Swiss-Prot record:
Class of enzymatic activity (EC top level): transferase
Phylogenetic placement of the source organism: Bacteria, Pseudomonadati, Pseudomonadota, Gammaproteobacteria, Chromatiales
Gene Ontology process terms (BP): glycine decarboxylation via glycine cleavage system
Protein name as it appears in the record: Aminomethyltransferase
Protein EC: 2.1.2.10
InterPro entries for this protein: GCS_T, GCS_T_bac, GCST_C, GCV_T_N, GcvT/YgfZ/DmdA, GcvT/YgfZ_C, TrmE/GcvT_dom1
Oligomer and partners: The glycine cleavage system is composed of four proteins: P, T, L and H.
Key words of the record: Aminotransferase, Transferase
Reaction equation(s) it catalyzes: N(6)-[(R)-S(8)-aminomethyldihydrolipoyl]-L-lysyl-[protein] + (6S)-5,6,7,8-tetrahydrofolate = N(6)-[(R)-dihydrolipoyl]-L-lysyl-[protein] + (6R)-5,10-methylene-5,6,7,8-tetrahydrofolate + NH4(+)
A Gene Ontology term for the protein's cellular component: cytosol
Organism per entry: Nitrosococcus oceani (strain ATCC 19707 / BCRC 17464 / JCM 30415 / NCIMB 11848 / C-107)
Example of a GO MF term: aminomethyltransferase activity
Any one Pfam family match given in the protein's UniProt record, by short name: GCV_T
Family the UniProt entry places it in: Belongs to the GcvT family.
Amino acid sequence: MGKHTAIFDLHRSAGARLVDFAGWDMPLHYGSQVAEHQAVRQGVGIFDVSHMTVIELKGEKVRPFLHQLLANNVDRLTVPGTALYSCMLNTEGGVIDDLIVYLMAEQEFRVVSNAGTRDKVLAWIESHAAPFKVQVEERPELAMIAVQGPEARAQVHGQLPESLKEKVVNLKRFQATWEEGLFVARTGYTGEDGYELLLSGSQAQDWWRRLQAGGAKPCGLGARDTLRLEAGMCLYGADMDETTTPLESGLGWTVAWKPPERDFIGRAVLEAQQAAGCPHQQVGLLLQGKGLMRNGQTITTNLGEGVVTSGGFSPSLERSIALARVPVGADGPCEVQIRGRAVPAAMVKPPFVRNGRACVPAELMEPIEVS
């Protein structure tokens, strides 16, 4: 039996199909993954993401510590409640994890990272924190609920205490606000607007019930994956890992090169890769024939072979889509090897869908039958 979140009993009583995810028993879906996906694109869905790792970093030298630890620059965060997305790299420039870091106070930051990387992330942070005398504290007692979709903000606003409502309503993307017992961030992993709520485990079931009573549809990991894939968002362990750099994984935008004297871990390798010319790039793939793209499938492009890093069926576009790593400069039509067949596909720039709207060229959307 795996670990259980504070909301687990509600998942089980709702008849969720439970699966193991990084040692946690988590809902894959509650009956229809496609219906859950569409609820987020068209209305509002809720996700239990309490398996995510939450870490508090405190100390006089916490900012210099994060200058070294992260590829992005926390000096962009000057006001408490602001946040940024970053990769944390090893000495070879590989991605240990991708994460969100929030400025909580002048000498305090909060990091939210992936569940599957918990042990190595904590070990890496702790091994580098000592010289800076930074206090590292995990917060496993906190639960986390993602409320996503075009109706998500209104749904949350209706449940907030008056003391917090105006602050939350005025949040911009990648901003957060909080009071005792409730942290609200305007972030997400679906390509839709919404919030992620951090709260004590004792409050989690009450919030879940109230959000559901207000019309939010419970959603599982299956819909979470198809939503993030449509949004062109990377999945750790598939689209990037410790053997790939941000530059070849579509994450070059998360690397802060300035100031040049900020010597973050992995910087020298990234600079050398950039100077030599990064050999790979990330692209989106839109299948033009029957089949389903999956991780590991070979792609034949105009400049050589590539590989699908994550793929699946897009409920919004009604065809298979994927993220892929291909030779730099490759473009145009390509072929994907699916069960021994070469199936035509088109290379496109992600995202595929954002805010409920298709982002791919209309001429590539001729109806096809997907098996």
